[in-house]
Structure formats: structure tokens, C-alpha cells
Amino acid sequence: MTKDGGKKDNQGQDKKAQQYGVTPQSVDFNDWYNEVVKKADLADNSPVAGAMVVRPYGSALWENIQRWLDDRFKASGHESLIFPTLIPMNFIMKEADHVEGFAPELFTVNKIGTEELAEPYVMRPTSETIIGHMWSGWLNSYRDLPFLHYQWGSVFRAELRTKAFLRTSEFFWHEGHTAHADEAEARAEVRQQLDLYHEFCRDVLALPVVRGEKTASERFAGAVATYSIEGMMRDGKALQSGTSHYLGQNFSRAFDVKYQTREQKEEFAHTTSWAISSRIIGAIIMTHGDDSGLMMPPRIAPIQVVVIPVGRKDNFDQMVQEGEKLAAELRAQGLRVKVDGRDGVTNGFKYNDWELKGVPVRIELGPRDLESGVLVVKNRHSEDKETLPRAEAVSGMSARLDTIHDFLMKRATDFLLANTAEVDSYDAFQREIEAGHWVRAYHCGEPACEKSIKEDTKATARNVPFDDAEFFAERGEGQCVKCGQPSAYGKRVLFGRQY
């Protein structure tokens, strides 16, 4: 922390930010986030309370996310299907923990026109119930297993305090659902998908995340075990960025999902579910953004390179044409490139606009550059410009983007580690949480004790890191930081305030 209470490595550039109309993070992080989402053309408010309109730039980002994940789901043998948005209310009621967990968030359909429905529907909060119902008719023999299914779509959960991408009453996701003959295979599936999410965050989004198991209090409603990846945002709050759940036979028993074994016995299937949602866009914004706006990870950015032709009125059209030729050279490498040929807009406005949108690399191309065979290149994360021979700049662009990815990953990792504290006393726990840090502490595992911590500090148990997690995997024994009872997990639990 800095002397004035700000976060370590804060990206404060107040004067510059005010000039461009974005509230600095250090002044009001919430305002900064909302302004960046809107001014960078990611999303806008809609006339439907709690729902957002995702604009083309935000939609292109989500499509890139979908494409990367979808390719890997299919490569591992998973099949896409489509289920209805409406689910019979009685399905939700069949699994006791499930209905208790989701009841306050349900959107209910009671009428068609003016006619009351005998059996109301709910708008899909998640699909375990309707998928279980259908599986019960599809599954007969052990030969049918495993079922490896997923779908992309919207889900609906009522939110009183909404925030674009992070908490909206309608949001977008994929949800995976699988059924297996035994527990070991199902648990392996759950871990495989969480590891895929971790790979995606690390290698594509440049997001360091902590993999681990949720405590009983934080488990998905109806699950035997829930696993998560947790990321630290630049205000120190945690964002649950992906989850996977081992559901045991709970939903199979509720929906009669059973099969005949090799020994001609009937057994209930072991099922899983797993998801990443549009919340991950919020993680990108809040992990990498600075006081000038977004900072897109290059491997997922809708536009990786923007070319800005610089010229006078009498030669501007020619420079735009030259910009398109340059863009074609870059696209031949498989890069996503935009030429900003807007007329009547100053170069300064264009520079600021693309800084706000977080495009990783900007190239300026003027008549003198063309004559000299050079390009002026600027990385989004740096204030410096480079003048490079054209061939060198073009041939080195993919490597440049990889270097930017590595920079973002290292900066975010350093920030996470610098703002996580290890404590053994409750006084220290409270101080660190109040300072906006994550805390690692021993805990007894009792839900009532966790609830007491949350009431005192607004912090929740994020997860218990895996033994092979990149961060905080060390094992150890100690006393609960709150009540003094022995630790339940053989290692420290990760706590923090969350989105």
C-alpha cells in the first residue's frame, strides 16, 4: 500500500485520465469501471432493469472467448446441445438444496396472455434440472456413458445491485453437464474443466488465478464439491472467474438418471456441471485496465493492431489506402487489424479513442514514414513510441504481441502477490481485509464461523488452494484465525471481499 492508502502499483494518471473523461481508479474505482464499459463501447444500459445491451466491440470480445473454449470442448469429445429457456417450476423443486439456493433469484412465468398457468415456469437460472430430466429418458446402459454435453446461452438470476458483466439479471455463459458411471471419472472431469479454465486465463487472458476447492458454505446449491478459479481485481476484490461442480448422485436420484451396469444392476449416474460466464469480461477490464481505459490482452482482443493513417486533406485518402495495404500484410499473419480511416476526426482523438478501447498496438503511418520505409509503433501499455523499419515492424508483430501478453501476466501476478497477506491473528485478519487485501489464514471449516467472519469483515472464503496450485499451495497446520479450533484443511484458506 502507498502512504495515502492507495493500492501498490496503482495506475494513477489523474491528469491524463481527466482529460479523456475517465474517472481515475484511485478516485473512484466503481465510477472508473462503469465509465470504461460505456465509453469503450463494450456495453450500455437497457430499458430492462438489470439487463445490459452488449455492443459490437463487447460482442466481438465474447465471440473470441466462445471460439477458444468451444474448439477445446469439441476437441475433448464434448457435444453441444440447446435446451429451452423456460423450465417447469416443479423441476426446480425436486432437489431440495438446489431450490433453497436459487429461490430468491428466480424469474417466474405465471401467465400466457391473461390466462393463468396451472404449472408456472422459471426462466433458466442454470440447467441441471431440465438436463437431468432429459437424461433420464436417454440413458439406459453403461454403454451410453459418459454423456459429455454443453450449451451456450443466457441465464436469469434476479440481481438488486447490478454491474455490467459482473452482476446482471441476465448474463451469458456456457454450461457443461456430464454424466459418468463412477465417482472417479466424474471427479476427473470436474478437474479437467477447471484446469482448462485456468489455462485459458493464464495463456490467453493473461489473468493469474488461484485454483482450489470451495468451502461447504460456498458450494453450489446441490453439489457435493465445488471448485473455482479466483482472480484479484485492481481494487483488491476477488472475482470468481469460473467454477466446476461434482454433483455426486444428487441430481441423478432426483431425476431418475440411472443405467444398467455390466453386472445387470441399476446404478445412478455421477454427474458434473461447469461454467465460465460473461463475468470474465469484467475480470479482463478490472485486472488490466488503467486510467486511460481498457488494456486488452492481445490473444483475445477483438482488434490486435490499429493502423492510423496520418495525412493532410489532399493526401488523406491515399494514406488510408496505404494503411489498408499495411493491414493486409498484418492480416496475412493471422492478426486482427483495424484501419481508422475516419475523416474529419483529429489524430489526437483517434489515439485517445483506441487507448480507451485498449487495442494492444497502434501504428501511425504518414507520408514521410511511407517515403522513409518506416512505421511509428506504440504499445498500449507504454508511453514510448518506436520508429522501426517497416519490414521489421511487420515481421515482428506477433512476437511483440506475445511480449505484451507476458508483461500483462507478470504485472497482474506481481500485484496479486503484493496484495495478499498471511496472518495468524484475527486483529491482523481484519486490518488486512480493511486495507483491501486478500488474506491467507487457517480456518476450522465450520459454516457458523465463516458466517461470523463475513458479518465482521464482509470477507468470504474464496477457496482452499489445490496442492498443485500456482499460488498458495503450501500445506501446514494451525488454529482457526477466528475461533482457535484446529484447522480443517491442512493448509490456509484464501479470504477476500468479492464481486
From Swiss-Prot:
Keywords: Aminoacyl-tRNA synthetase, ATP-binding, Cytoplasm, Ligase, Nucleotide-binding, Protein biosynthesis. Residues 1-21 are annotated as: Disordered. One of its GO terms (cellular component) is cytoplasm. InterPro entries: aa-tRNA-synt_IIb (IPR002314), aa-tRNA-synth_II (IPR006195), aa-tRNA-synth_II/BPL/LPL (IPR045864), Anticodon-bd (IPR004154), Anticodon-bd_dom_sf (IPR036621), Pro-tRNA-ligase_IIa (IPR002316), Pro-tRNA-ligase_IIa_arc-type (IPR004499), Pro-tRNA_ligase_II_C (IPR016061). Its EC number is 6.1.1.15. One of its GO terms (molecular function) is ATP binding. It is an enzyme of class 6 (ligase). The keyword Ligase applies. The keyword Calcium does not apply. Gene3D superfamilies: Anticodon-binding domain, Bira Bifunctional Protein, Domain 2, C-terminal domain of ProRS. Coiled coil: none annotated. SUPFAM superfamilies: C-terminal domain of ProRS, Class II aaRS ABD-related, Class II aaRS and biotin synthetases. It comes from the Bacteria. Residues 1-17 have a biased composition (Basic and acidic residues). GO terms for biological process: prolyl-tRNA aminoacylation. Pfam families: HGTP_anticodon, ProRS-C_1, tRNA-synt_2b. It is found in: Cytoplasm. Homodimer. Belongs to the class-II aminoacyl-tRNA synthetase family. ProS type 3 subfamily. NCBIfam families: proS_fam_I (TIGR00408). Catalyzes the attachment of proline to tRNA(Pro) in a two-step reaction: proline is first activated by ATP to form Pro-AMP and then transferred to the acceptor end of tRNA(Pro). Can inadvertently accommodate and process cysteine. Consists of three domains: the N-terminal catalytic domain, the anticodon-binding domain and the C-terminal extension. This is Proline--tRNA ligase.
